[in-house]
């Protein structure tokens, strides 16, 4: 009987569960780690980049995607599903700008996509998208914002969060780093150091290299939103700074 409920997207089990949605969320949790931090002067995303010796490194495959001038996102889970939804996000943002002559608010863009993701949990003959997202952005109403969404279509705003592999341990580390002495909103520079610590824990200290990390953040300069993508030498400097701090603490 359990297999009957497993194979039906739209039917609840006797325990009130939608197994296909839970399987989609599990698929998203097995992908590379992505960390998001809301800073007082920006928002930062750091994610694990898949590296293979046989891959052509001259053709980069970015994990962090720009959606419009104010918003970017990172997806974990099924890559093909993620590409489809990123394209959908860009279309929603462009359509809003065409209709209203201004950039779409961050939360509205997240909500619009989550409506689509939720619909796929109740359509017969379809399956949920196996992708979780972190969004970073800015709008004139709420300033800098960080959102997380999952395959069920649920979303929420965060000060710091993590999705993907070892997200539970990463969340504990974020709690320790940011809230152990009372929460104080970090600067972007401080957020970089926290992100490196978390990624070092999820990847392992010996595996933490600039080739395996992608870090980007958004800030405002005057009336312009500016996206920054860290170069490998900048990431290497952050890793070395984190390693030196560990040595001083351990000595």
From Swiss-Prot:
One Pfam entry name: Proteasome_A_N
UniProt key word Nucleotide-binding: no
Subcellular localization, as worded in the UniProt entry: Nucleus
Main location, first listed in the record: nucleus
GO cellular component: cytosol; male germ cell nucleus; nucleus; proteasome core complex, alpha-subunit complex
Keywords: Nucleus, Proteasome
A biological process from GO: proteasome-mediated ubiquitin-dependent protein catabolic process
Tissues in which the protein is found: Testis, prominent after meiosis II. After meiosis, predominantly localized to the haploid spermatid nuclei of the 64-cell cysts, remaining during the elongation and condensation of the spermatid nuclei. In mature, motile sperm, expression is seen exclusively in the sperm head.
Summary of subunit composition and partner proteins: The 26S proteasome consists of a 20S proteasome core and two 19S regulatory subunits. The 20S proteasome core is composed of 28 subunits that are arranged in four stacked rings, resulting in a barrel-shaped structure. The two end rings are each formed by seven alpha subunits, and the two central rings are each formed by seven beta subunits. The catalytic chamber with the active sites is on the inside of the barrel.
Family: Belongs to the peptidase T1A family.
Function description: The proteasome is a multicatalytic proteinase complex which is characterized by its ability to cleave peptides with Arg, Phe, Tyr, Leu, and Glu adjacent to the leaving group at neutral or slightly basic pH. The proteasome has an ATP-dependent proteolytic activity.
Protein name: Proteasome subunit alpha type-4-like
Protein species of origin: Drosophila melanogaster (Fruit fly)
Gene: Prosalpha3T
């Amino acid at each position: 009987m359990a297999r009957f409920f497993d194979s039906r997207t739209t039917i609840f089990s006797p325990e009130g569960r939608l197994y296909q949605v839970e399987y989609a969320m599990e698929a998203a949790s097995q992908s590379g780690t992505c960390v998001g931090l809301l800073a007082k002067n920006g928002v930062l995303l750091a994610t694990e980049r898949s590296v293979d010796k046989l891959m052509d490194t001259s053709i980069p495959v970015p994990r962090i995607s720009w959606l419009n001038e104010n918003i970017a996102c990172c997806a974990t889970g099924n890559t093909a599903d993620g590409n489809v939804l990123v394209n959908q996000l860009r279309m929603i943002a462009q359509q809003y700008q065409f209709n209203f002559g201004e950039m779409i608010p961050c939360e509205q863009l997240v909500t619009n996509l989550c409506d689509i993701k939720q619909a796929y949990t109740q359509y017969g003959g379809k399956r949920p998208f196996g992708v979780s997202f972190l969004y970073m952005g800015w709008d004139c109403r709420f300033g800098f914002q960080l959102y997380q969404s999952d395959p069920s279509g649920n979303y929420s705003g965060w000060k710091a969060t993590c999705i993907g592999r070892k997200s539970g341990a990463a969340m504990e580390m974020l709690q320790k780093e940011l809230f152990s002495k009372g929460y104080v909103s970090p600067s972007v520079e401080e957020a970089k150091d926290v992100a490196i610590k978390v990624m070092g824990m999820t990847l392992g200290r010996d595996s933490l290299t600039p080739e395996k990390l992608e870090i980007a953040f958004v800030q405002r300069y005057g009336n312009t939103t500016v996206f920054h993508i860290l170069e490998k030498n900048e990431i290497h400097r952050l890793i070395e700074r984190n390693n030196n701090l560990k040595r001083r603490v351990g000595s």
